[in-house]
Amino acid sequence: MDKFIILKSSWGIAISYEIIEIINHNQNVENENEVSPSVFVELKENSLDNSSLEYLAKGIKSITQFIKIFPVCFSIEKLEYNVCDYQPEGMYYMFRKWFFESHNMEVPPINVYYDKETNKYVFPELIDVEEL
């Protein structure tokens, strides 16, 4: 499994994952959501809360300009994380990391800092992602 990690304090965000890209996808699958026209996500293990699923969908929407063949489905085969080392926002960046690495593209940097007062990681660029 691949791994996404952010560590800027005594704790971090860590998500292990396996994702498969299915090109010319046939849209008759359970646990599948259309996140934008002709772009789908399928959860093999339906283990995401609504907030995490939202950030995953936003991560997928953020890369649609780079998709060359439609329809496409991103099948989330496995996801593993410890709730002590997790924030839902991590799903956005985990997907982007996977996509860019899978397509031999440079992974964009992540603007993040740890806020000691709220005991959370803050992702300033995700404030503008609400519209996606």
Q: What residues fall within each predicted segment?
A:
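Accessory interaction regions appended to the cores of large information-processing enzymes
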Residues: 1-132
